[in-house]
Amino acid sequence: MKLSRRSFMKANAVAAAAAAAGLSVPGVARAVVGQQEAIKWDKAPCRFCGTGCGVLVGTQQGRVVACQGDPDAPVNRGLNCIKGYFLPKIMYGKDRLTQPMLRMKDGSYHKDGEFTPVSWEQAFDVMEEKFKTSLKEKGPEAIGMFGSGQWTIWEGYAAAKLFKAGFRSNNIDPNARHCMASAVVGFMRTFGMDEPMGCYDDIEQADAFVLWGSNMAEMHPILWSRITNRRLSDPNVKVAVLSTFQHRSFELADNGIVFTPQSDLVILNYIANYIIQNNAVNQDFFTKHVNLRKGATDIGYGLRPTHPLEKAAKNPGSDASEPMSFDEYKAFVAEYTLDKTAEMTGVPKDQLEQLAQLYADPNKRVISYWTMGFNQHTRGVWANNLVYNLHLLTGKISQPGCGPFSLTGQPSACGTAREVGTFSHRLPADMVVTNEKHRDICEKHWQIPAGTIPAKVGLHAVAQDRALKDGKLNVYWVMCNNNMQAGPNINEDRMPGWRDPRNFIIVSDPYPTVSALSADLILPTAMWVEKEGAYGNAERRTQFWRQQIKAPGEAKSDLWQLVQFSRRFKTEEVWPEALLAQKPELRGKTLYDVLFATPAVSKFPLSELKEDQLNDESRELGFYLQKGLFEEYAWFGRGHGHDLAPFDDYHNARGLRWPVVEGKETQWRYSEGNDPYVKAGEGYKFYGKPDGKAVIFALPFEPAAESPDNEYDLWLSTGRVLEHWHTGSMTRRVLELHRAFPEAVVFIHPLDAKARDLRRGDKVKVSSRRGEVISIVETRGRNRPPQGLVYMPFFDAAQLVNNLTLDATDPLSKETDFKKCAVKLAKV
């Protein structure tokens, strides 16, 4: 086969990415231009992380047979990470589910029965009976849903609409609660609006990069390649990496900092103190655009109210704050001296000063990146607020190459979980259920009776587990996630709750995951390009793709499942008489009629599409469902700083970053000349706040919920590895990725291993106060913990690491701290 220069470069990019992971390259990736005449190519965003890389998908005879980086995609510019190159294989695991499976005994449903194939009609019959019984006997608070940052935009929107407007239950929450909730609350507290103000274009213009609890080399490798290129192209560019253990991102670091768990709060306040003491505050920016507030402290750990830590907290769950002066703030951070910070964090003084100087230097453009190290933290919201403080003190924000940037881990944690409003407290476009005006806006736009949407915040992820255990939540639908493996403290609440005979659990999934096998009913689900979809990535880029192949067997998209199930309920069965009296014309109609077949949603005909562009749902319903849902949803944000472009624009583009006003996307929000919502002469305007000013919060160090002691003498931190994504339900079914990292290990310092008579490769029992797992000792390799800490990835279903973790959460965001609990090791 003769290759062009461009194809040759592409093939070598694939080989380089594979070599970095120690893998062989699949033939479909290696043969970049082979048999192009027989393969149909179309664009799609990658199925994995929140970077939002663009890929070209090659289909042939109804299957995905090839994949390559999209050279026209601005995010990745033709390059994929190793997971991206193996995308063609994620849908073809030998155990792919192709028909509904119900636990049955003697021909009918039984909690302890064996999984038995049933039709969709039978599956929905059982679901309908369980939903209607719970709604009739206990009301909307007895049903719930756990969704996903992997839902497409219209799937998340349909789910939120069905539960909040249809079933009148706010007990819907996404798995983004476990990864991005602290970022959401941090953004809302400081700026009054969610999501980053900058974009990936900052990378090529920055002078310094600071990673806070983020191993971008493995978790966001395409962005890391751009940072690496920037660092190696200019000797004046600096990289600082902060973590509780060394990892691959340290290889590029000019200043690699390992700190004691939880003490990142101390470092952040020290830097603020350094900026003030060295007269590095941007006084003009600060005076015009910033307010100061002192936050409530001693706020607890999001545990059950009966837990001793919650009983001891003075202000459990409080997000209160009060105004303070600059002198008061200066005095507050003055306590975080260099000596005190070095002592509390274990970080050498020269490294701390070097880090602080990056932020304080007025001539250095600095980007702060963070992911789970900040967010999965019992003070994760505070950590987010404190890093914003540094950028607001110095004015290094909302300009090219400058700004704080929260990275996401799922492909649409931003576009779906956050923007659509699938959290238990949120509605579309940053609106919330507790705000009467916001509820009224939604009810009028959806043309449903006033008062339909409950004002009470629903159950968040961990609260759902507890309610299942307590028998208060009785019907639970889990979609597009594997929470039985991914969620914290499996044995305490979740597993007992799922297997409680009072409860009925539905899991929609393509594979028999730990969650699916723990359920009562499994619904087979279409994946990725087996459906038409849309994701929103970490830089506010909304990206669309067409359905390119059909799902196997009877597998159906999450959207199909939600919409078709809504047909089973008439308004009289879910709404009280007082609501129906407001709109008697809705009597006798199904939730499908009221929510999904409305004139607003169903007005786009199939004639807008070519035959080969039709998707299964629209073909079945007779109208362009996805376009109708998107346009209805997009209305909420237009004119309010969340503007999305018209639907058709996205199919013709490689994504657009909102707000999109008059056809132009926005790279940098809140700054004049970049953001259409900032008028000439305003300079900066943080328009999420009534006065247009961002907030600096004074927040102290507070200890972790659980720390090592004489018995459980090691910190445990959990996370991911390059080759696998989350629980491995897709990547472990790709033979090459599985071979590259076949089982989880315990990364441990050699001296800690020696003290316990452990050697590399030994089997070891890892125990916490909540459970235990058997794993393998690893004293070398990519992750190098300090003494006193071990690190374990959670992708391995044979090693349920979350048997060990504590379900302590940030009291403000309700996000779990997966990075800090106490364990002990014993040789097996």
Swiss-Prot record:
Leading EC class: oxidoreductase
Enzyme Commission numbers on file: 1.9.6.1
Reaction catalysed by this enzyme: 2 Fe(II)-[cytochrome] + nitrate + 2 H(+) = 2 Fe(III)-[cytochrome] + nitrite + H2O
GO biological process, any: nitrate assimilation
Endpoints of the signal sequence: 1-31
Binding positions for [4Fe-4S] cluster per the UniProt entry: 46, 49, 53, 81
Cofactor annotation remark: Binds 1 [4Fe-4S] cluster.
Gene3D superfamilies to which the protein is assigned, alphabetical: 2.40.40.20, 3.30.200.210, 3.40.50.740, Dimethylsulfoxide Reductase, domain 2
Residue ranges annotated for the 4Fe-4S Mo/W bis-MGD-type domain, each copy included: 39-95
Nucleotide-binding recorded as keyword: no
Task performed by this protein: Catalytic subunit of the periplasmic nitrate reductase complex NapAB. Receives electrons from NapB and catalyzes the reduction of nitrate to nitrite.
Family: Belongs to the prokaryotic molybdopterin-containing oxidoreductase family. NasA/NapA/NarB subfamily.
HAMAP family: Nitrate_reduct_NapA
Protein name (record): Periplasmic nitrate reductase
